[in-house]
Swiss-Prot record:
One GO process term, biological-process aspect: arachidonate secretion
Disulfide bond residue pairs: 26-115, 28-44, 43-95, 49-122, 50-88, 57-81, 75-86
Residues binding Ca(2+), per UniProt: 27, 29, 31, 48
UniProt family annotation: Belongs to the phospholipase A2 family. Group II subfamily. D49 sub-subfamily.
Domain of life from the UniProt record: Eukaryota
Keywords annotated in UniProt: Calcium, Disulfide bond, Hydrolase, Lipid degradation, Lipid metabolism, Metal-binding, Neurotoxin, Postsynaptic neurotoxin, Presynaptic neurotoxin, Secreted, Toxin
UniProt EC number: 3.1.1.4
Subcellular location: Secreted
SUBUNIT field: Heterodimer of a weakly toxic basic protein having phospholipase A2 activity (B chain) and a non-toxic acidic protein functioning as its inhibitor but which potentiates its lethal potency and neurotoxicity (A chain).
Function: Heterodimer: postsynaptic neurotoxin. Monomer: snake venom phospholipase A2 (PLA2) that shows presynaptic neurotoxicity. PLA2 catalyzes the calcium-dependent hydrolysis of the 2-acyl groups in 3-sn-phosphoglycerides.
Protein name: Basic phospholipase A2 B chain
Residue ranges crossing the lipid bilayer per the database entry: none
Tissue: Expressed by the venom gland.
């Protein structure tokens, strides 16, 4: 669920880091359109696409099992859609960490005027 996803992000990037991704670029936060602005925004685009492929439960609400081991996110013995959601969130949190050097404060607080291009397909 979104709370667990936030905890993954904070676990990889430090306390309160999730706030940097709530409204960023064209895809981080609720909804999304246009072309991702940078590698960080692409992490959100890929995460949105991943959630879009989940069948059988609501990715924003479903509770799954995971832990941190040696700084790595490890999804637990989840079945079906819970496994899929955990993997979506794990991959995105790792993506944010791997691309933290691309984070651009100018893209915070996304604006629909910056995201008017035709949206990419998943």
């Amino acid at each position: 669920n979104l709370f667990q996803f936030a905890k993954m992000i904070n676990g990889k990037l430090g306390a309160f880091s999730v706030w940097n991704y709530i409204s960023y670029g064209c895809y981080c936060g609720w909804g999304g359109q246009g072309t991702p602005k940078d590698a960080t925004d692409r992490c959100c685009f890929v995460h949105d696409c991943c959630y879009g492929r989940v069948r059988g439960c609501n990715p924003k609400l479903a509770i799954y099992s995971y832990s941190f081991k040696n700084g790595n996110i490890v999804c637990g013995k989840n079945l079906g859609c819970l496994r899929d959601i955990c993997e979506c969130d794990r991959v995105a949190a790792n993506c944010f960490h791997q691309n933290k050097n691309t984070y651009n404060k100018n893209y915070r607080f996304k604006s629909s005027s910056r995201c008017r291009q035709t949206s990419e397909q998943c």
